[in-house]
Amino acid sequence: MEIERINEHTVKFYMSYGDIEDRGFDREEIWYNRERSEELFWEVMDEVHEEEEFAVEGPLWIQVQALDKGLEIIVTKAQLSKDGQKLELPIPEDKKQEPASEDLDALLDDFQKEEQAVNQEEKEQKLQFVLRFGDFEDVISLSKLNVNGSKTTLYSFENRYYLYVDFCNMTDEEVENQLSILLEYATESSISIHRLEEYGKLIISEHALETIKKHFAS
């Protein structure tokens, strides 16, 4: 994937269809399956944020152009008006001359509703994490700490170990406390669980930390 930072509010990136398939997505389903296309978009935006420090805040203006061998995507963040009272989308001059099918306020309202829905989905997803380890010894060290209450699955992918953690039925405080322990031995990864399931190697399907402790941490 190629990323180009246009300015403070705009970033452009190009993804070949090979890039898309390498991430575990089918080139056809991204057009017809909204859930999967959004999953791909936010996975890519996480990488854009890491590489370009492009934080996604507020409504977005998104242009997608289908090319012969991939997609070119331009993402622009809405900006506050000079009086600080209204969000404005920096639409290019050539687009402003085209007949608008919707009033800008209505368009922004739709963006805000979409953003609220995304935020709610992200809040729910924050009960699940993918963690990357430097080596297997770090996984063993973590298993000795008796981190309980979460569901854990271990994968290997591209010579790294990844632990999928599901903090189901845990309070925000419990999640925060356990995550702080986990992050002493691992780093949070932007790789999705779907990509690990598709391209990674499943090592331990459930109770991963308990199993590792039983066999390696005696």
From Swiss-Prot:
Pfam families: MecA. InterPro entries: MecA_C_sf, Neg-reg_MecA. It comes from the Bacteria. Gene3D superfamilies: 3.30.70.1950. The N-terminal domain has binding sites for ComK and ComS and probably for unfolded/aggregated proteins; the C-terminal domain interacts with ClpC. Homodimer. This is Adapter protein MecA 1. The gene is mecA.
